Amino acid sequence: MPYQPYITGVWYNKDLWEEAGLTEQDIPDTWEKLIRVCRKIKNSDSGLSAMTCDEEYVNLLYGYQLARYLGQEKVQQLIRNCTWSQIPQAKEAADDIRILFFAGYMSQSAPAQHPEGQDEVGDGEAVMVLQGSWVPNEVTEATESVDSWGFFPWPAVKAGTDGTEGVMVGAQGFGVTKDSQMKQEAFDFAYSICTGETDMKMTDAVNSIPADTDNTQWPEVLADAVPYMKEMSKPYMWAAGLEADPDYKEQIQSELLKLTRLEETSDEFIENLSNMK
């Protein structure tokens, strides 16, 4: 039974956004516009980092970018067939993500140990982070900040297969073991937690998306994501399919950390992934 649904995308500190001289008109829907926003933040007098990230979530950066070029199904095919060197968009996506770090758009501490990266948004050091809808609550509690949060989907790329209608969504869930002697009672208990007044109490307590579709009021910190959830027509799995093969997800993650730490070039990244099978 689905519980605590989530949506992923770029969450940003609205106060820092304004401090860097940005307005709602600057919210990017394309990769070029995102780079323009990052450049504007870097060149401002704010001293802010445009973006930040944590080590365990670098796969979201590359997964989203690759899926924008190819679509999620072809991302999975690429991994399954290990055709990294044969798909030019694989290197192009690597170039894109690497430039965020090489050009200084990412925080100097990124990729940081979790949750030090995402906490920079609450500490007034970085403006944006690609994360799930749990991040505003986590950061607010960790940093004791009272900032407002904004949201936009990971942007589209030129000549890409998917646009901002592709969004990584999911949920936690309750299950009943097959050996349970009280299956119906367990189901009824889980249902009582995920619906009605109890669902809203949990939503209010941790600023999460309601599980019950009859509970239409989202927490204020997540409100900017509501229209994008309604426009979503292509649901992505975790990291947009980048972890579809459990035998190789650790190798992919290892190479992504080297790429984002600027320890290898995009060419080396693709070469190493091509040799993983």
Question: What residues fall within each predicted segment?
Answer:
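A structural signal for short loop-to-beta-strand junctions that line the ligand-binding cleft
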Residues: M1-W17, S49-A50, T161-V167, P235-L242
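Extracytoplasmic/periplasmic substrate-recognition and gating elements
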Residues: A20-T23, A103, E141-A205
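Short, solvent-exposed loop/beta-turn-alpha elements that line the ligand-binding surface or hinge
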Residues: I27, Y69-E92, E141-E144, A156-E165, ...
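Short helix-initiation/N-cap motifs at beta->coil->alpha
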Residues: D29-I35, Q108-D123
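Glycine-centered hinge/linker elements that transmit conformational signals in sensory
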Residues: I35-K40, R80-A110
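Paired acidic/hydrophobic, glycine-rich loop segments that form the ligand-binding mouth/hinge
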Residues: V127-G132, G150
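C-terminal capping/gating helix-and-loop segments adjacent to ligand/active sites or protein-protein/ligand interfaces
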Residues: V206-T216, D224-K277
